[in-house]
Regions:
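Glycine/small-residue-rich interface belts in oligomeric ring/scaffold proteins
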Residues: 19, 24-69
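Beta-strand elements of well-folded, non-transmembrane domains
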Residues: 7-11, 58, 113-121
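Residue-level signal for secondary-structure boundary sites
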Residues: 13-15, 62, 121-123
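N-terminal, Lys/Arg- and Ser/Thr-rich interaction peptides
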Residues: 1-21
């Protein structure tokens, strides 16, 4: 059973992993970010969201901004030291460690996410597809979520609601846009985190993920 969710917001940043210093966003929301929004609305160990299609409702627009970030991170060695009972500084001084970085972000983003969910082996005997479908429907109608959905960064919150129409008019009808390699998701299955990519093609304003080939 599929569901359609409308998401929109002022800014978004789906940062390309190959550009580590200056932040540069992908042209549209990534499948993993879309799944993260759905998880923020309804997450349960007995189900897993699968994004089928992403409809782009607003033209792709960019904005250059500068953001305050910290230039270091807490090391795993310091964490282990504190866990073993020894004293060590386990914090970052944001005032002393602050730096500004440029970022190319998206603005005025507006999508419709078409998705379904698969049941997992962690589902209990009382769990069923109809149960989860009804739970998602109620949460969309009431605007409920487990935590605030966001577009790539928590500074860019995503508003959401159920898509009430039978058709979707995109910003790019009768147009095909090659978006290049895009992050699909992260594979956590074999003890190490492996990024997965796919060749993103925006056809008639729709990013179709149903039969895309994934590269590791």
């Amino acid at each position: 059973m599929s569901i359609m969710v409308e998401v929109y917001g002022d800014y978004a940043a789906f940062n390309r992993p190959e550009l580590k210093v200056e932040r540069m966003t992908y042209d549209v929301i990534t499948p993993s970010a879309a799944r993260g929004i759905l998880d923020a609305i309804l997450w349960h160990p007995g189900m897993r969201w699968v994004v089928d299609k992403i409809y782009v409702l607003s033209p792709i627009q960019y904005a250059n901004i500068r953001r305050n970030e910290v230039k270091s991170k807490i090391s795993a060695r310091n964490v282990r030291t504190v866990m073993n009972g020894r004293k060590n500084d386990l914090y970052i001084d944001a005032q002393a460690d602050i730096q500004q970085r440029a970022a190319l972000v998206l603005k005025n983003v507006h999508y419709v996410l078409e998705a379904h969910f698969d049941m997992t082996d962690k589902a209990s005997p009382t769990d069923s597809p109809a149960k989860f479908q009804e739970m998602m429907k109620r949460r969309l109608e009431k605007g409920q979520c487990y935590h605030q959905p966001y577009f790539g960064c928590r500074e860019f919150p995503a508003k959401f609601r159920k898509w009430e129409f039978k058709t979707v008019n995109t910003a790019y009808p009768n147009t095909t846009k090659e978006l290049g390699l895009m992050l699909y998701d992260m594979d956590y299955g074999k003890g190490e985190i492996t990024p997965m990519y796919f060749n993103a093609v925006l056809k008639n304003g729709v990013l179709d993920l149903t039969n895309c080939e994934v590269y590791r």
